[in-house]
């Protein structure tokens, strides 16, 4: 049951890729959905032997990939945060576990080391809008309230149950038909007056 709830919360986060122009309704070529995350494709057609591709969120470098095509060596920065993969048409970065704080402009910055001269340029830049659905926002608002209400009701239920149990026990003790009633002590000693009366009756019978 708990796993189903977590899956539902994860699906509440919806990611929508938008271009830099607000009125542009064309499909984004930079962002695509991939295994619950977003694939950011940085395309370039230059023939280079060694280059570095950096993924920028605003002005912050999230991760980069350096490739030497002669040796086939690649070095990726921050592999835990984002994964990278080089291909014939460019470099792909994969971002996962996105939330609303990741909404920003993302840019691909290419640095060419070989062939010379050294060059650095931004080859693509688009805005990634990550928003939380209204259902998820309502759930995140009402879930703590519901949990708190459940705890309060549970505590009061336990208190009421204990009080009811004690009340039933006390009523069973004071009930005269209860098997737990204490038996009163009975005094079996004979009274002297009654004995005298008995003797007098015997004497009268003898005289007669």
Curated annotation (Swiss-Prot):
PTM text: N-glycosylated.
Protein name: Inducible T-cell costimulator
Subcellular location: Cell membrane
Signal peptide range: 1-19
Extracellular topology ranges: 20-140
GO terms for biological process, alphabetical: cell-cell adhesion; T cell costimulation; T cell tolerance induction; T follicular helper cell differentiation
Glycosylation sites (chain numbering): 23, 122
GO CC, any one term: plasma membrane
Record GO terms (molecular function): signaling receptor activity
Keywords: Cell membrane, Disulfide bond, Glycoprotein, Immunoglobulin domain, Membrane, Signal, Transmembrane, Transmembrane helix
Record's keyword annotation contains Cell membrane: yes
Parts of the chain that traverse the membrane: 141-161
Cytoplasmic side: 162-208
Function, in words: Stimulatory receptor expressed in activated or antigen-experienced T-cells that plays an important role in the immune response. Upon binding to its ligand ICOSL expressed on antigen presenting cells (APCs), delivers costimulatory signals that enhances all basic T-cell responses to a foreign antigen, namely proliferation, secretion of lymphokines including IL10, up-regulation of molecules that mediate cell-cell interaction, and effective help for antibody secretion by B-cells.
Membrane topology value: Single-pass type I membrane protein
Span of domain Ig-like V-type: 30-132
PANTHER family according to UniProt: INDUCIBLE T-CELL COSTIMULATOR, INDUCIBLE T-CELL COSTIMULATOR ICOS
Quaternary structure (record): Homodimer; disulfide-linked. Interacts with ICOSLG. Interacts with PIK3R1. Interacts with TBK1; this interaction is critical for the maturation of T follicular regulatory cells.
Annotated S-S bridges: 42-108, 63-82
Domain of life: Eukaryota
